[in-house]
Amino acid sequence: QQQPFATIAQEGKAPYIASMALRKLYMDRAVDEEELRAFTEMMVALDDEFEFDSYEVHHQANDTIDAVGDNKKDAKPEQGSIQSNPNKGKEKDVNAGTSGTHTVPRIKAITPKMRMPKSKGATVLNLEHLLEYAPQQIDISNTRATQSQFDTWYEAVRMAYDIGETEMPTVMNGLMVWCIENGTSPNVNGVWVMMDGNEQVGYPLKPIVENAKPTLRQIMAHFSDVAEAYIEMRNKKEPYMPRYGLIRNLRDVGLARYAFDFYEVTSRTPVRAREAHIQMKAAALKSAQPRLFGLDGGISTQEENTERHTTEDVSPSMHTLLGVKNM
């Protein structure tokens, strides 16, 4: 009784859908080859011409047709009418940036008149590429290890710990939290610890530090955003300040999410947070005195002693003074 099916039924017609399609729709039952063959034979029997006749299909020629222009070309001017412009062709599209006959100019960000570096009279820049080139700051920053360096470090650590691909992400979780608390100094040694319930599980730091190229801090910079979110999550449950911020006496808990030494400062970092992070870094490096050279253990400072002493000498380091002896 629904429209338009009611009107179709009054005209002697009725919508048709095959029973095979209904079973597929409501019972999710696939149609087999026998049913398709029987359905095809039935349709051929209903229309004998369907199988024997041939049909020709003619496609429209690939000509560009202008509906407005063709109508004007075929139409004959009426008698007594004045033809204003008989040679007028296709009308120009209306520009949305125009007002009447005045065009609003568009200023380019980079123009060819700008002074540019040149070599042998030719510009060495591709301006079209430069207008579209806007990489992420962290992807080209030298404070972060490249993706290939991080992949090499990750695989080297996994091979050194002899653990599988499925277990490595859990180890990386523990390493990130440990570095938030203890920093990423290249002078760290011994073991780093992660918790398994109430049990401490130690891992050697040697493969972590030795395989970190250029530095461990640049490797851990890949964890910066996740570490920031982790600190924020901990602060939702209880007050949490990383050890890096506790040592620097950071009093504002709202800045705790920036209180770790491998935090990446970007253009989106608030000014107050950037100042606090730089002050903490300056305080951490103030007492550090890096030495280019250490004490060389292969150099001897002893010299050959050519002095000759006798029993008449005043002392082992002083000869006789004309018979005067030390009293």
Curated annotation (Swiss-Prot):
Coiled coil region boundaries: none
Listed InterPro entries: Poty_coat
Pfam families named among the record's database cross-references: Poty_coat
Keyword Repeat appears in the UniProt entry: no
EC number: 2.7.7.48
Entry keyword set: Capsid protein, Nucleotidyltransferase, RNA-directed RNA polymerase, Transferase, Virion
Site positions (Cleavage): 60-61
GO cellular component: viral capsid
GO MF entries: RNA-directed RNA polymerase activity
Keyword Nucleotidyltransferase: yes
Region described as Disordered: spans on this chain: 65-102
Known catalytic reactions: RNA(n) + a ribonucleoside 5'-triphosphate = RNA(n+1) + diphosphate
PTM info: Genome polyprotein of potyviruses undergoes post-translational proteolytic processing by the main proteinase NIa-pro resulting in the production of at least ten individual proteins. The P1 proteinase and the HC-pro cleave only their respective C-termini autocatalytically. 6K1 is essential for proper proteolytic separation of P3 from CI.
Signal sequence bounds: none
Family listed: Belongs to the potyviridae genome polyprotein family.
Protein name: Genome polyprotein
Organism this protein belongs to: Potato virus Y (strain Chinese) (PVY)
Organism placement in taxonomy: Viruses, Riboviria, Orthornavirae, Pisuviricota, Stelpaviricetes
